[in-house]
Regions:
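ATP/NTP phosphate-donor binding region
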Residues: 1-88
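Glycine/threonine-rich beta-strand-loop-alpha-helix active-site module
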Residues: 66-123
Length: 123
């Protein structure tokens, strides 16, 4: 199912609610997650996404990790893996993960692609 959202400034975007399908990215993909989500779902995600290069950054659980040290950890991983403007950062989890990944994607090389994959239960 696709839900179209219209913002106050008349900009729109789609939210896709579905099971993840097998997807290949002709670019580098970095997944940002935490130990809780990765413990339940990371292997499933690895089965569904393939890319030129696929790597994972695991940040600690908790609101206290919503800080610049966490952003630095994500950005260092991006630099070490030589992500470019066509690369993709995937927020794999909710709250803190989405906020940190979105911010990191917005400032890395003036902005790179960012996906959010929210997880609500065990597979």
């Amino acid at each position: 199912m696709i839900v179209n959202i219209t913002l106050a400034n008349d900009k729109t975007y789609d939210i896709t609610i579905d099971r993840l399908k097998d997807t290949y990215f002709d670019t580098k993909v970095v997944v940002v997650t935490n130990p809780t989500v990765s413990g339940f779902h990371l292997e499933y995600l690895k089965e569904k996404i393939s890319a030129k290069q696929f790597s994972v950054v695991t940040i600690p659980d908790g609101e206290e990790y919503k800080n610049m040290d966490t952003i630095e950890m994500i950005l260092e991983h991006c630099f070490e893996n030589r992500l470019d403007r066509k690369s993709l950062l995937v927020a794999f989890g909710g709250g803190v993960i989405g906020d940190m990944t979105g911010f990191a994607a917005s400032i890395y090389q003036r902005g790179i692609w960012n996906w959010g994959i929210c997880v609500s239960r065990k597979p």
